[in-house]
Amino acid sequence: MKIRGFFALLLTGLLAAVAAFAGQPVAELYDKAEYRIAMRDSVALYTAVYTPKAPGEAPVIIFRTPYGCGPYGAGRFPQGFEKGYLRSYVDRGYIIVMQDVRGRYMSEGDFEHVRPAGSGETDETTDSYDTVDWLVRHIPHNNGRVGFAGCSYPGFYAMMGGLCGHPAVKAVSPQAPVTDWFMGDDVHHNGVLMLTDSYRFLSSMNTPPGRVPAAKMPSMSRQTQPDERTFFLEHTALAELTGLLKPNPFWEEMSAHPDYDAWWQERDLRRACYNVQPAVLIVGGTFDAEDCFGAWNLYRALNRQSPSTPCHLVVGPWAHGAWRNGRTLGAFDFGSDASWEYYMEHFEVPFFDHYLRDGNTDEAAPLPAAAVFSSGDNRWHTFGRFLSRGARKLTLYLAGGGILDTRRPTAKTSASTYVSDPSDPVPYCEVSGLRRPKEYMVADQRFLFGRPDVLTFVSEPLEEDMTLVGPVDADLEVTLSTTDADFVVKLIDLF
């Protein structure tokens, strides 16, 4: 049997010229200044500004982060300025701004996870506005045009920058953006607690008393050492897991809201995405185990709720954030067109250059509305704003005898049963280690065949390739012998 499924979308981009000083040490090209920018409530946010020494006006790109924007101190530059993703902005002479968000690392104030827009006198939109306003008035040689970019949690802050309303903000790129921590990103997947990731991640996000440099911030939690699966099988009660943590207000508050109630709903980024003024470039990966949901669904929300916003989507065959550093995943090499160099040259750099350097805010960037990479033929495909246009609906039926078929079963009644043992849950990867491997998203799943708690339905071998575009919905009719259950449905390719 074969089902070849690709979530495919894509685009073609512009070639961008590289500045003449490409390859020079960054200290020869840039000056660094550190500021504590006062917000409207007098809370000061640590902000590092890297300004090109070359004469002339330059656009500003801002990266706001809860993870620390070190190295701190005069004359010290991030290692990423020498090569890779950030080097693209160095070589193009952007004014690069990095800021610790409120309550994190060297910034003052109280940190709040996914602080909702409009939740008080200050939030991430007001902090973004106040930062931009200070920068355009105080940083020499800026051209008055500002962008925000960020990946994962910083992707949330990038979108908040796009919602801040400052007229200088012309373009933003939320990448793998935290959008809804209950429905799909990081903490839950379809409302089911993603325990391995959320427990490790949220326990690492406690801010210690006072402001300390990044080198002294707590490292990623080691609560799940030495073996992740064994750890969680030995600590099955949520209260027990909570007791192993240092005091963690967000974990405790989250645990008190097991359902999609108003507390979660107000933390859905999409609720604020109306009448968005800057252009938006959303980036995601089909094999992103953390925040795949955010990219697709933020794009849909913007098209529906803010139709006049120039909005672009790029989704490649990447794990979380891998468009910034690689083209391979596990045993698969998706080719040079999936490399970070290709991504930057064809998508991100042309996007920001168009709106920030060239100032073409009256016309859309020369990018497709949506570009998606098909991991079957290793090609980019382009789409209009509505991703499923031209596609046809496909229904697959689970039939008796473990058959997966496009034809509706003729039997009037049919049932498949299994017994799930909580003491031996179905593993998501064949080998359990210190933490979840990103490669599990493309790993061979046949090690699960034959387990008594897994039902497998297999089609006839496909006679030709099949490309899947759009969401996959599972419609199950079930009878339980217990009070509740979570179901995981996988549509996979046997090759």
Regions found by a protein language model. Give the residues of each.
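Glycine-rich nucleophile elbow surrounding the catalytic serine of serine-hydrolase chemistry
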Residues: 150-160
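Conserved alpha/beta-hydrolase "acid-adjacent" motif
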Residues: 289-296
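N-terminal cap/lid segment of alpha/beta-hydrolase-fold proteins
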Residues: 23-56, 458-464, 477
